[in-house]
Amino acid sequence: MHKSLQSGFSLIELLVVVAIIGILAAVGTVGYGNYVSQTKVKAVKTNVDAVAGAINTLEGLAQAGVDPACSNYTTCIGTSGSTSAMNLANFKNPYNTSTTGGGTATGAIQFQAAVACTAANAGTIYVTPSAFVGDVATVTVLGCDTASSSYNVSVGWGAGP
């Protein structure tokens, strides 16, 4: 009598492997989704801090009179669509890739009062000065990090040292 030698995997073994791969894929997909959303939140916080830091630097330049193109808030920071010492037209925002400024409300950085955060404006950064008294104001930099939450930093402008 001959014994037949079988090689390969049984159907049960293949089904077990497929089930394990399916479980790993399901767990990995959920983990990746959380990773992406947390990365976007961190990107907005980093961008808000960077813009606030740039405003602080420009405020120092304006106070020192070092840069003739930066003598007050309007010439240093500017508004949507204007040229200024801050030159935010080249600002790169990996979360919101819309063009900065340009006179429309679609840019990655808006020079207007912040609106409620929604899915449509998640990733947008709003730069809003309070009412000026002379050339002194508080500038709020707010970033919508998700559809329902935001991160903001307030920066003094023109108060002097």
Outline where the language-model segments fall.
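Periplasmic/extracellular, small/polar-rich flexible segments of pilin-like filament-forming proteins
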Residues: 57-161
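Aromatic side chains
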Residues: 9, 32-35, 95, 126
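Membrane-proximal N-terminal amphipathic helix
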Residues: 37-66
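Residue-level signal for functionally critical sites in structured catalytic/ligand-binding pockets
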Residues: 2-9, 40-41, 61, 159-161
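N-terminal single-pass transmembrane signal-anchor helix
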Residues: 2-33
